[in-house]
């Protein structure tokens, strides 16, 4: 298993404070135009911005889903982060300290990308690069799409250094960038066949323990888990 100590120096894990940011509709529209210019140029497509804002924002979402982890300019990251962080603030941040808990454990239903936990856990695939299907509603897509292109770039660096696909039941960590959380912990759950096996259970248990151990290694105080492998990977939720 490729451990934190082996990749922590090839990505930036330093947390930087973010200031409150409110963008006008005109500012958002201008950022979308500039981002689309870059993304369309990469795709060798012609730029045309007569669309309403929501259509342009959805185009950005889909294009970023499909974009390979190639380098991007500092200017692109600057304007992307402004737009995405303003959207995070508009969506509202849920303070994990306000969620009722028992024995330091809480069950909460909602959008995990709104939680300000020290880390949120992403149910990833073994490429660890996020979902490439435009506008797909899986948690992997949603987390990458709202955090920003930096997450895919960081994961690509980790995977390049690791030299192989991510084993199921392990975990990796990146910054969360434009999410309210500080970090994202990425873990790959078991893909269940016709019935759940003991190996499936062992691997799923490993996802949770590996994530918790990584959080402990990073000295994090709160971690938010989504349900791992209960979607298209087929692990029955009632067995969790």
Name what the model sees in each region.
Residues 1-240:
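Macrodomain-like recognition of ADP-ribose-binding/processing modules
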């Amino acid at each position: 298993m490729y451990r934190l100590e082996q990749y922590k120096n090839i990505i930036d894990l330093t947390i930087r404070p973010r200031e409150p940011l409110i963008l006008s509709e005109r500012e958002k529209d201008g950022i979308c135009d500039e981002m689309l210019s870059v993304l369309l140029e990469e795709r060798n497509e012609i730029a045309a911005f007569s669309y309403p804002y929501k259509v342009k924002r959805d185009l950005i979402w889909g294009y970023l889903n499909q974009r390979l982890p190639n380098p991007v300019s500092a200017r692109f990251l600057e304007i992307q982060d402004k737009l995405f962080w303003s959207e995070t603030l508009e969506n509202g941040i849920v303070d994990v300290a306000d969620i009722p808990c028992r024995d330091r454990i809480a069950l909460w239903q909602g959008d995990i990308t709104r939680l300000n936990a020290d880390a949120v856990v992403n149910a990833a695939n073994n490429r660890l690069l996020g979902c490439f299907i435009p506008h797909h509603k899986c948690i992997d897509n949603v987390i990458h799409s709202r955090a920003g292109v930096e997450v895919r770039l960081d994961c690509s660096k980790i995977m390049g250094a690791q030299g192989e696909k991510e084993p199921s039941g392990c975990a990796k960590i990146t910054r969360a960038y434009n999410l309210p959380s500080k970090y994202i912990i990425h873990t790959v759950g078991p893909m269940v066949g016709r019935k759940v096996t003991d190996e499936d259970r062992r691997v799923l248990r490993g996802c949770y323990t590996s994530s918790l151990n990584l959080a402990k290694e990073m000295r994090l105080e709160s971690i938010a888990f989504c349900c791992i492998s209960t979607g298209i990977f087929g692990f029955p939720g009632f067995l969790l």
